[in-house]
């Protein structure tokens, strides 16, 4: 069934809304004065009731399930329900002209800010119909996407549809066939797997598939979310996915389950640097591999500065705050100091090289091969070339290029 959240309106009516993500209802913490306003009791009695209500709500009971005196229960339940708040991403009604006016204005504003690429987060949940599934309905998904693209074209914006699904479902191919770039959510886990096993055969296979099928991707190491795992199903054997999970968790990460289901993994939350054991050589190797894989590189700021797992931030965030492990705020002074470190300098060198070399691009040619623990990438374009030869056991790499940029 579709995820429905009942939203209470000021007139007391409960109205159903589609709410795909982060569906949570929060009730207020009551005090004695709140109880005294709705029930004819003295302060001492009101204080006891308030404490009992707060304790039971915190334990997960619904207001209607409270074990308090019947003479005041209806009033207290009404008070709680009237003041409840919601945590969620409310789904918009894509059949409403007002929503499309909002989309148009949003894209116009983003373009005015200088945006060139706009991510469409979880776009495949947008079209819904009673009796249909809640994800990637066809043809509705592609019709909505095309409608957004026409708006984006007015403002010279490129759309980047965001979708998480297992490799075996081939949804990334569907997006590419519709003419869109897509996220390479496979690469972060693949690189960890390659560096931990010393085997680059899966990276080679994936790079060749991207080139042969002309799939244009935006790739990454870490990001504002976790390191994707669900996506790897069908690409990497289950036992190796479990090894990635065990390794990252042993290094201080957290496992995020799919829709809260235990033992149905979705992602692991950790900084990429900590996921690699806070090893500078591994981090630089990972960045070099990213720069030479097909795609447009995206860089998460905390990876660039070799950020470590922020367990204190997770504690401060409370339940559901696992993502804060990889969202540490850095001060200008911290950044200034980190810019002096070798790991930051070398990453910036790699980024500069990837940005200015003519050897790379969606129109370039790539030859990739593995021999034992050695993986080699050779890019050629416009008469220029760039080569990465990387040892996945020692984490040593060598880059050469015809332009003499990387020196």
Predicted regions and their residues:
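Active-site and adjacent substrate-binding regions of carbohydrate-active enzymes
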Residues: 1-407
């Amino acid at each position: 069934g579709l995820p429905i959240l009942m939203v209470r309106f000021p007139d007391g009516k409960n109205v159903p809304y589609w709410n795909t993500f982060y569906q949570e209802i929060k009730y207020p913490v009551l005090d004695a004065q709140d109880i005294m306003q709705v029930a004819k009791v003295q302060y001492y009695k009101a204080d006891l009731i308030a404490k009992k209500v707060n304790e039971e709500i915190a334990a997960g009971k619904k207001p209607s399930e409270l074990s308090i005196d019947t003479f005041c229960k209806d009033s207290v339940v009404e008070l709680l329900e009237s003041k409840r708040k919601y945590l969620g991403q409310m789904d918009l009604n894509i059949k409403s002209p007002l929503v499309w006016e909002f989309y148009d204005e949003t894209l116009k504003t983003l373009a005015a800010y200088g945006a060139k690429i706009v991510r469409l987060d979880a776009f495949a949940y947008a079209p819904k119909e009673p009796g249909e599934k809640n994800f990637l309905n066809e043809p509705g998904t592609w019709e909505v996407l095309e409608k957004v693209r026409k708006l984006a074209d007015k403002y010279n914006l490129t759309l980047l549809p965001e979708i998480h699904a297992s490799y075996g479902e081939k949804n990334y191919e569907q997006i590419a066939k519709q003419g869109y770039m897509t996220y390479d959510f496979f690469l972060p886990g693949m690189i960890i797997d390659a560096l931990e096993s010393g085997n680059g055969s899966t990276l080679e296979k994936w790079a060749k598939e991207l080139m042969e099928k002309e799939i244009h991707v935006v790739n990454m190491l870490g990001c504002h979310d976790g390191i994707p795992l669900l996506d790897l199903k069908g690409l990497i054997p289950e036992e190796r996915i479990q090894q990635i999970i065990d390794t990252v968790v042993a290094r201080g990460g957290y496992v995020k389950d799919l829709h809260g289901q235990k033992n149905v993994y979705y992602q692991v939350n950790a900084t990429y640097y900590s996921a690699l054991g806070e090893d500078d050589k591994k981090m630089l190797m990972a960045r070099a591999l990213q720069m030479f894989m097909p795609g447009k590189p995206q860089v998460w700021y905390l990876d660039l500065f070799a950020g470590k797992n922020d367990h204190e931030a997770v504690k401060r965030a409370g339940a559901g705050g696992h993502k804060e492990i990889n969202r540490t705020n850095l001060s200008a002074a911290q950044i200034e100091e980190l810019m002096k470190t070798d790991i930051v300098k070398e990453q910036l060198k790699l980024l500069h090289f990837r940005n200015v070399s003519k050897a790379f691009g969606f129109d370039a040619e790539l030859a990739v091969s593995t021999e034992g623990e050695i993986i080699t990438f050779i890019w050629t374009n416009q008469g220029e070339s760039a080569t990465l030869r990387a040892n996945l056991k020692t984490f040593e790499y060598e880059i050469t290029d015809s332009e003499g940029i990387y020196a």
